[in-house]
Amino acid sequence: MKTIDQPTLSSFAPTGVLRVGINLGNPVLANEDPISKNLYGVTIDIANEIGKRISLPVQLIPFKSAGATVDAVKTGEIDLVFVAIDPVRGADISYTPAYIQIEGAYMVKVSSPLKTNDEVDAAGNEIVVGKGSAYDLYLTREIKNAALLRAASSQTVIDDFMSGTGNVAAGVKQQLESDAKRYPGLRMLPGRFMVINQAIGIPKARANYESTSAYLSNVIAELKQSGFVADAMKRHNIQGAKVADQ
């Protein structure tokens, strides 16, 4: 097990507490118990393991969307974030290799004439996305003809869609499948339009961010190889995702 030196640790967690941003907008990563408000999920397990390895207390700070967690890590409010790898965010955030891969999918109403993912990017189609999400950033780059309509978060995409916004909903496959149980008359287009690589991100503004990122990359490699990530996914009943390749 690789150890972390004091200058790197001081740069990584300058307050003496590891402040971790938890994205509740993606149920693959984390969830909140509606009664106790306790946070649980794969990212919570990884955060606590990192805290144990560096001998610091962990403060879990929940956010409703990936975009909000990214903003917080860029301003230095938090020390670490679990977020999708994206080149736009990469200007300010240093990533580890991915620990989980998630599929992005499209959902339409059963009456829709759309049958395949390739048909979505056409003039007249309107795709509802979660503002600032990994798939929003991806589709912003890739979609040429359809329009993108941004919901406040990934969790509200289907609510907006069912209230009459757009004719296609985009999101993490598991989130869409969960939402479809709340609303009748929806169907998923087969396959996926992207693979979302989830990683740990830290702010590049910190003095020793490169050595911190190297340390965390080693931790992630160990957690994948040892079965820690796979066990966490099984424990939290995560479907529609897989442990990222080594």
List PLM regions with ranges:
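Extracytoplasmic small-molecule ligand-binding "clamshell" domains
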Residues: M1-A84, R89, L223-S226, R235
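Ligand-binding clefts/hinges and TM-proximal coupling segments of bilobed small-molecule sensing domains
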Residues: M1-T3, T8, A134-A151, M188-L189, ...
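Short loop->beta-strand "edge-of-pocket" segments that line small-molecule binding or catalytic clefts
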Residues: V17-I22, Y40, D118-S133, A147-L148
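Periplasmic-binding protein-like
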Residues: L24, Q101-V108, K173, E177-I220, ...
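Ligand-binding cleft/hinge of the Venus flytrap
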Residues: A30-S36, A47-P57, D121-A123, G132-S153, ...
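Short helix-initiation/N-cap motifs at beta->coil->alpha
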Residues: I44, Q59-D71, L114-K115, L149-S163, ...
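A ligand-binding cleft/hinge motif common to bilobed small-molecule-binding domains
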Residues: G67, A84-D92, Y138-R141, M162-V195
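Flexible hinge/capping segments at coil-to-helix
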Residues: P97-Y99, V108-I127, E210
